[in-house]
């Protein structure tokens, strides 16, 4: 790995050619520490512990150091149970407060839970900040293109025009005093799919810090990550305590504490060294490799891409990320990664950056210094291009070209 001297790099593609970047792109995914041990005996040399739970159609995991592992694990398990509660609150796939809001708000204001209200306000702020590239009301377009039920279809121009009439967060009416929301249009629908997972991660992290835990990492489905504090390292470890990842870096083994394995052991590890939590960005065509690593301390990362959620029609591939301003699936980007203070912001901005494309995403980050981006797209001469802004050279390590 080497530091980037500039904000733009091209990477040689080992394939003879990128037939179609939309055909070859891997699913946008952040690589976090992944358990690779095969036996409980190997856990004795662990320097990371984690708990895991399925929610929101993905796996959530919380990583932490072994010191006081038993106590931290109990808190982490409760934090992940909170994620499940939040899913029940925000889902639009079954009866929930959100489905009630969608059914009622065009007729009368609907009072909602205060934290969800604040989340919707944040979503509206990001809608305005991104000039509509992120829009919580774009679910109608997702349905129109068949992604809601994973049955892809291509709507005609007339249908897209009709769908766009029911899209737009400018049609939301917020009443801060009563914490109610109303819709100006009867066909408006809110869907928190682009920000809800990040919100759940933020809430779980908040729960952890309220219980005195300062150093941990949470991810949801490897597309949203929040790191708190530092990753504490052992001063010394046995030779077999690490293994090499696909890019040659040492990847510590971890110990799973929840969902299908074993009870934690006590640890006497000392905290003599630390480093930022490192997450990897997957190469779009070499799925076993990382194209870059980002070091995180008290920051979040979100990544968006269309590698798996797509369909073909008459030989053309359509991805699930739709520009809410045009009603058309986005093209021209492998993946978009956002770095932000919170996971909710990173989640939403990753989608917005994918819609914007590299140039406008970088322009956005230049105007909003609290955010950063990494944009991966097709380059020239069978290369993969990476643009980034708002992430220091100390935080971003880029894979070498060879």
Regions found by a protein language model. Name each.
Residues 1-402:
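Mature catalytic core of soluble alpha/beta enzymes
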């Amino acid at each position: 790995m080497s530091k980037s001297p500039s904000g733009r790099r091209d990477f040689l593609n080992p394939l003879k050619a990128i037939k179609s970047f939309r055909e070859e792109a891997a699913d946008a995914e952040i690589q976090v520490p992944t358990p690779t041990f095969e036996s409980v005996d190997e856990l004795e040399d662990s320097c990371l512990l984690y708990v895991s739970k399925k929610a929101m159609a993905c796996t959530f995991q919380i990583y932490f150091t072994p010191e006081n592992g038993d106590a931290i694990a109990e808190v982490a398990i409760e934090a992940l149970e909170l994620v499940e509660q939040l899913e029940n609150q925000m889902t639009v796939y079954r009866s929930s407060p959100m489905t009630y809001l969608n059914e009622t708000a065009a007729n009368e204001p609907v009072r909602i839970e205060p934290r969800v209200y604040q989340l919707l306000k944040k979503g509206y702020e990001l809608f305005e900040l991104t000039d509509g590239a992120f829009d919580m009301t774009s679910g109608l377009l997702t349905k129109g293109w068949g992604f809601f039920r994973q049955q892809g279809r291509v709507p005609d121009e007339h249908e897209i025009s009709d769908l766009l009439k029911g899209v737009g967060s400018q049609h939301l009416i917020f009443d801060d005093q009563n914490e109610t929301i109303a819709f100006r249009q009867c066909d408006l629908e809110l869907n928190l799919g682009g920000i809800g997972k990040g919100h759940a991660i933020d809430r779980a992290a908040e729960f952890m810090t309220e219980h005195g835990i300062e150093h941990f990492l949470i991810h949801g489905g490897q597309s949203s990550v929040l790191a708190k504090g530092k990753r504490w390292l052992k001063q010394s470890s046995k030779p077999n305590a690490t293994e090499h990842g696909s890019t040659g870096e040492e990847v510590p083994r971890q110990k799973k504490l929840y969902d299908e394995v074993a009870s934690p052991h006590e640890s006497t590890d000392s905290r003599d060294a630390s480093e930022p939590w490192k997450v990897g960005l997957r190469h779009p065509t070499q799925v076993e490799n990382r194209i870059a690593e980002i070091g995180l301390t008290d920051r979040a990362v979100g990544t968006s891409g269309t590698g798996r959620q797509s369909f073909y029609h008459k030989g053309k591939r359509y991805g699930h990320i739709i520009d809410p301003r045009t009603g058309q699936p986005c093209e021209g980007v492998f993946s978009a990664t956002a770095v932000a203070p919170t996971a909710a912001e990173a989640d939403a901005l990753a989608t917005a950056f994918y819609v914007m494309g590299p140039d406008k995403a970088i322009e956005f980050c230049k105007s909003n210094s609290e955010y950063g981006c990494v944009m991966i797209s097709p380059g020239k001469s069978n290369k993969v291009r990476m643009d980034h802004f708002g992430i220091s050279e100390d935080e971003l390590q880029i894979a070498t070209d060879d």
